[in-house]
């Protein structure tokens, strides 16, 4: 009997233990479900990590310097750069030894000082012995070619304003101060195709406030040139070593004048570059150091061998 009572008392105890375990398990399950429900009830975090924006990497050294023989290149130096330029054009070579192929003939020279106060913007001042001209110029890089190809070209805008400072007399025909001014505007579009080869094309627009005319048989003053002139320039660079490139350009006036059309220019030469200097020596048939003078008045004909020797020297300092 004791065994039966003992056995009988064990079964309810075991049952109570099992029931307690089941209840605890059920409570734990309910608590877990409640916690899960609470977690599920929380609004999902919809914020995502900001995408990593890669900084654009621009193509460098499309050309070696500011000049491409007689034309501006697409390049604008880095911020804080001072640049001093000396440009020289000798006389034409067709007279041979009589003037040492133009080296001892009359020559044009220009000095130019420029500075880059902010990124992509260059301002400059120049002076030339040609008609005692002084000029102010601005160059702004609008678009730059990227290495990943997202921007395939560089685009730069160049503008100058030139003042003829010669004394007014019957040869200069200056009546008003505004008669002394001329202007030049150019959009330069360039692409660096490889580490060694670059091309650029540049449509330009020039304007002279005052131009000489002539009298016809009736005594009426007639224009020789239009006051506005359009032209297209094409230039290229082929790098042959770390410090040397072959350079060339072609300038084609577009506007037809009433009496005297300008002749196109063909130039080719060598560009030698160091860390702080750029030196170009070349032969071509543009004799002026003013782009608007060249596109308006050039009469040197390359078909007749009317070429001249010229050079550009640039010295750069960065602060």
Model-derived features: where do they sit?
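Transmembrane beta-barrel domains of Gram-negative outer membranes and organellar outer membranes
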Residues: 34-166, 170-173, 181-185, 190-193, ...
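Short hydrophobic "helix-edge" motifs at membrane interfaces and signal-peptide entry regions
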Residues: 17-18, 108, 232
């Amino acid at each position: 009997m004791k065994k039966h009572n003992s056995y009988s008392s064990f079964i309810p105890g075991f049952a109570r233990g099992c029931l307690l375990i089941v209840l605890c398990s059920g409570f734990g399950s309910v608590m877990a479900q409640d916690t899960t429900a609470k977690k599920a009830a929380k609004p999902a975090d919809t914020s995502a990590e900001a995408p990593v924006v890669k900084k654009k990497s621009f193509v460098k050294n499309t050309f070696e310097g500011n000049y491409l023989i007689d034309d501006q290149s697409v390049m604008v130096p880095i911020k804080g750069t001072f640049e001093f330029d000396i440009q020289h054009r000798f006389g034409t070579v067709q007279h041979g030894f009589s003037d040492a192929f133009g080296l001892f003939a009359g020559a044009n020279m220009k000095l130019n000082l420029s500075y880059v106060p902010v990124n992509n913007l260059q301002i400059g001042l120049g002076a030339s012995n040609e008609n005692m001209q002084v000029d102010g110029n601005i160059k702004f890089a609008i678009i730059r070619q990227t290495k990943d190809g997202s921007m395939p070209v560089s685009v730069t805008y160049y503008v100058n304003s030139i003042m003829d400072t010669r004394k007014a007399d019957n040869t200069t025909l200056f009546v008003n101060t505004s008669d002394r001014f001329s202007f030049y505007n150019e959009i330069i579009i360039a692409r660096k195709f490889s580490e060694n080869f670059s091309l650029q094309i540049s449509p330009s627009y020039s304007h002279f406030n005052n131009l000489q005319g002539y009298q016809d048989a009736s005594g009426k003053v007639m224009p020789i040139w239009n006051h506005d002139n359009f032209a297209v320039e094409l230039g290229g660079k082929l790098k042959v070593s770390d410090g040397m490139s072959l350079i060339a350009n072609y300038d084609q006036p577009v506007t037809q004048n009433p009496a005297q059309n300008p002749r196109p220019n063909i130039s080719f030469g060598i560009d030698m570059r160091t860390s702080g200097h750029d030196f170009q020596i070349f032969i071509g048939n543009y004799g002026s150091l003013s782009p608007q003078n060249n596109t308006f008045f050039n009469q040197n004909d390359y078909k007749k061998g009317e070429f001249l020797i010229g050079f550009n020297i640039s010295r750069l300092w960065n602060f």
